[in-house]
Amino acid sequence: LPLVVANFMRGGPGGGSIQPAQSDYWQATKAMGNGGYKMIVVSPGTLQEAVDLTYKAFELAERDRNPVMILADGCIGAMMEPVTLPEMKSDEQLEKEKQARKNWLVNGFKHREIGPVNIDLWGGRTSMLAMEAIAAGEKPGPRGLEESNRVSGELYERWAKEDTMVELYKMEDAEYVITGYGTAGRVAKSAVDALRAEGVKVGMIRPIIVFPFPYDAYKALDPKKIKFILDVEMAIPGQMVEDVKFAIQDRIPIHQFGRSGGNIVGREEIIAAFKAL
């Protein structure tokens, strides 16, 4: 079934603060839950982006019949900005979408018949063998479960090819790269502008969908041109930096700067960390 979950990260670990942080990245992108399932994870950097990505999250969840996570931080959850909402859908559009849901939506009433189950909705074959076992009052066996996992794997591979989203900012002539996501990425963007004003050729890579991670954006960097990468996060130790390292494979030096415990990373701090390298 489609599901959208919003995670507004706060300072941790354990019973930490309710201030902004980015300490749940690993949990959201690497350890989503038992059984090895995965989900698309979007991470807005502005309120407008939060609005747009929320709509997109529901579309993706319904498309794949799979959970989608909105991974934001306390800044996004607490601040106010003007936003533009998409146009209202017509009654005809709403009715068309409603009809499309009839092949998976259960009504919750025992005395009503459950509508036809479309086993082809999710990745094609899905767990037909498992469903047959359940219908017969049996537990799904290894054969059906393995088939389900294999089809899921095909879905995840398709995400990696078709569902990445990343912002490349002033990267055309960049000799240095600052990277970050969410609020840290937004602040990093202002640091890039300030450094550019000083004549430093620096650009930014900001993942907007953090799972699947946009590895290709980093793999495309020319090690003969880029002198180093500075990863900026509101997490100590850094977490997204591990994905950056995996993409770069030691071809370019990578450094990490972070704040934690509910402290919001600042533009001047990023600039100071950059100049110290």
Regions of interest found by a model, annotated:
Residues 164-201, 205, 211-217:
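Redox- and metal-dependent alpha/beta enzyme cores, enriched for Fe-S-associated oxidoreductases
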Residues 7-15, 46-48, 74-76, 208-211, ...:
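Acidic, glycine-rich active-site loops and adjacent beta-strand->loop/helix elements
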Residues 19-74, 266:
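Conserved thiamine diphosphate
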Residues 229-277:
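Peripheral docking tails and interdomain loops at the edges
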Residues 14-21, 52-55, 79-86, 217, ...:
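Short acidic, glycine/serine/threonine-rich loops at helix termini
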Residues 65-167:
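Conformationally flexible catalytic loops at phosphate/diphosphate-handling active centers
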Residues 3, 57, 178, 206, ...:
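Buried hydrophobic positions in well-ordered alpha/beta secondary-structure cores of metabolic enzymes
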